[in-house]
């Protein structure tokens, strides 16, 4: 599906840019603890940007299987919630934002389960 190729590419681009920003723009400006949190956000951002390409491939191969599309939107939501909350937490150091992160993690897990089920069931 075209939308997931576009989302995957945009998110991979953002992950690379945000990784570079963390390494060169934030180093020495935020505590090391929060720099590591930033890098965790970047790492999961890239993993799931690539995951969106997997969704695009499966959505093309299994057209009409709504669970694959749902998995893609959950994965995208996971990027926003998980990585997004870690980025904001890193620069603001507002610890309550850490409560949002697990919601993104759950979205990631559910999306991967849905991909596995669709692959086993329909491929």
UniProtKB/Swiss-Prot annotation:
Say which species the protein is native to. Bacillus subtilis (strain 168)
What triggers or suppresses the expression of this protein? Answer: Negatively regulated by TnrA under nitrogen-limited conditions.
Q: Which family does it belong to?
A: Belongs to the UPF0382 family.
Keyword match Transport: no
The record's subcellular locations are:
Cell membrane
Tell me which domain of life the UniProt entry assigns to the organism this sequence originates from: Bacteria
Q: What is the name of the protein in this document?
A: UPF0382 membrane protein YwdK
Any stretches that span the bilayer, and where are they?
3-23, 49-69, 71-91, 96-116
Which keywords belong to this entry? Cell membrane, Membrane, Transmembrane, Transmembrane helix
* Keyword Methyltransferase recorded: no
Fetch the Pfam families from UniProt.
Answer: DUF423
Q: Name one GO cellular component term.
A: plasma membrane
InterPro entries this protein is in?
Answer: DUF423
Membrane topology per the entry is:
Multi-pass membrane protein
